[in-house]
């Protein structure tokens, strides 16, 4: 496991975007597609903006990229401004040269949620598995919609959202919790664990306790991202504020490796 510590959220976004570009170019040079798992929410927005900048500068093409998003609300119209389908197209897909046929987002409006989730897992497998799964975490350490108490062996399924998550997401619905969907389709913890690499973005002091629990405490279903401790190639990228709850020696150790880590994303 690696922990990358950057000064602020902008530098977290820069490092993450450069890493994604590096992986895409490596795959393309070998005549392969790169399969990406992608998140929504406020944390990855900076990364998407940087990736668009790299695309506009001619540094990267997304023609050889396939994507699978982490989650989608149930019974929220696809064209709703707060659907994750709208989020991804408004903030990323519409601005790059990705083939729409290579974009995969769960359909929360299907009449058969179980079948949709099974098909999603099948499509991931047919694509050769996810090469790099990018994710964010909630203040309670949840990844995707795998909230506290979720099975660490879980796969894509329908989840009922807890009150904390609904309240946290109310800001996207004008502060009205009655407008927030109460269920979502989400990849499972094991779905993420199956990826060849996982990259978790954490910014802000409100995520500091979650980062501490994720990397300095034991693995627990009450902090689902802690399962990444068992992943063969997991990287956490955090800003200084997100490290406030970490031990001094933990921060010192990983900062001592930063020159090496930065050399991996130089282009």
Swiss-Prot record:
GO terms for cellular component: cytoplasm. PROSITE patterns: GLC_GALNAC_ISOMERASE. The active site is at residues 71, 140, 142, 147. InterPro entries: Glc/Gal-6P_isomerase (IPR006148), Glucosamine6P_isomerase (IPR004547), Glucosamine6P_isomerase_CS (IPR018321), NagB/RpiA_transferase-like (IPR037171). It holds the Pfam family Glucosamine_iso. It is found in: Cytoplasm. It is an enzyme of class 3 (hydrolase). Its EC number is 3.5.99.6. It catalyses: alpha-D-glucosamine 6-phosphate + H2O = beta-D-fructose 6-phosphate + NH4(+). Pathway: Nucleotide-sugar biosynthesis; UDP-N-acetyl-alpha-D-glucosamine biosynthesis; alpha-D-glucosamine 6-phosphate from D-fructose 6-phosphate: step 1/1. GO terms for biological process: carbohydrate metabolic process; glucosamine catabolic process; N-acetylglucosamine catabolic process; N-acetylneuraminate catabolic process. GO terms for molecular function: glucosamine-6-phosphate deaminase activity; identical protein binding. Keywords: Carbohydrate metabolism, Cytoplasm, Hydrolase. Homohexamer. HAMAP family: GlcN6P_deamin (MF_01241). Catalyzes the reversible conversion of alpha-D-glucosamine 6-phosphate (GlcN-6P) into beta-D-fructose 6-phosphate (Fru-6P) and ammonium ion, a regulatory reaction step in de novo uridine diphosphate-N-acetyl-alpha-D-glucosamine (UDP-GlcNAc) biosynthesis via hexosamine pathway. Belongs to the glucosamine/galactosamine-6-phosphate isomerase family. This is Glucosamine-6-phosphate deaminase. It comes from Caenorhabditis elegans.
């Amino acid at each position: 496991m690696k922990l990358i510590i950057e000064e602020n959220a902008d530098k977290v976004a820069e490092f993450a975007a450069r890493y994604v570009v590096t992986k895409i170019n490596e795959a393309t040079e070998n005549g392969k597609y790169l399969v990406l798992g992608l998140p929504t929410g406020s944390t990855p927005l900076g990364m998407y903006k940087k990736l668009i900048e790299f695309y506009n500068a001619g540094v990267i093409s997304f023609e050889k990229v396939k994507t699978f998003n982490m989650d989608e609300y149930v019974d929220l119209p696809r064209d709703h401004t707060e659907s994750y389908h709208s989020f991804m197209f408004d903030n990323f897909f519409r601005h790059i040269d990705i083939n729409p046929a290579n974009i995969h987002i769960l359909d929360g409006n299907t009449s058969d949620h179980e079948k949709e989730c099974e098909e999603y897992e099948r499509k991931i497998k047919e694509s050769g598995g996810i090469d790099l799964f990018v994710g964010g975490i909630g203040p309670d350490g949840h990844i995707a919609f795998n909230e506290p108490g979720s099975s660490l062996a879980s796969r894509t399924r329908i989840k009922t959202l807890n009150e904390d998550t609904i309240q946290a997401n109310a800001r996207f619905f004008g502060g009205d919790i009655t407008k927030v969907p109460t269920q979502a389709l989400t990849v499972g913890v094991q779905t993420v664990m199956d990826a060849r690499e996982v990259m978790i973005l954490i910014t802000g002091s409100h995520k500091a306790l979650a980062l501490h629990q994720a990397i300095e405490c034991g693995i627990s279903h009450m902090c689902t991202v802690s399962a990444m401790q068992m992943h063969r190639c997991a990287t956490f990228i955090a800003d200084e504020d997100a490290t406030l709850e970490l031990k001094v020696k933990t921060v010192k150790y990983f900062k001592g490796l930063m020159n090496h880590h930065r050399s991996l994303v130089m282009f």
